[in-house]
């Protein structure tokens, strides 16, 4: 069974800020990841119903549906989905709520791409372990 490597990891980036989506998309593709983007939670859920992703990176503070609500809906669809949350309004209650809700990791904006890459490496190893269990 072929293991998931970092470069094979598929990632969905969800943020209502086009600049954040663009920077993450370009930075992660440059590292060899397969990256798609969504501008809001509804678009993300539609994309997740059509395509498989190993990881979702989502903003917490978005318009019609928060990243916390998106996190909950994704976990209902796929409890093993690795979800990273990011926000410029990080408060302890936000962090606790997301981590208790099943977030894999939490990032503060402005993002440090190095931190994201380290966490994605860990997520890739975790995805590889899960794939061996289900092969």
Q: Where are the regions that the model predicts?
A:
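Non-catalytic signal-transmission and effector/linker regions of two-component phosphorelay proteins
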Residues: 1-10, 131
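Short amphipathic alpha-helix used as the core "switch/output" element in two-component signaling
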Residues: 46, 68-80, 97-100
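C-terminal output helix
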Residues: 91-93, 111-121
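The feature encodes the CheY-like receiver
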Residues: 21, 63-64, 87, 91
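Acidic catalytic/metal-coordinating carboxylates
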Residues: 39-43, 65-69
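Two-component/phosphorelay signaling modules centered on CheY-like receiver
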Residues: 18-36
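Active-site beta3 strand of CheY-like receiver
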Residues: 51-57
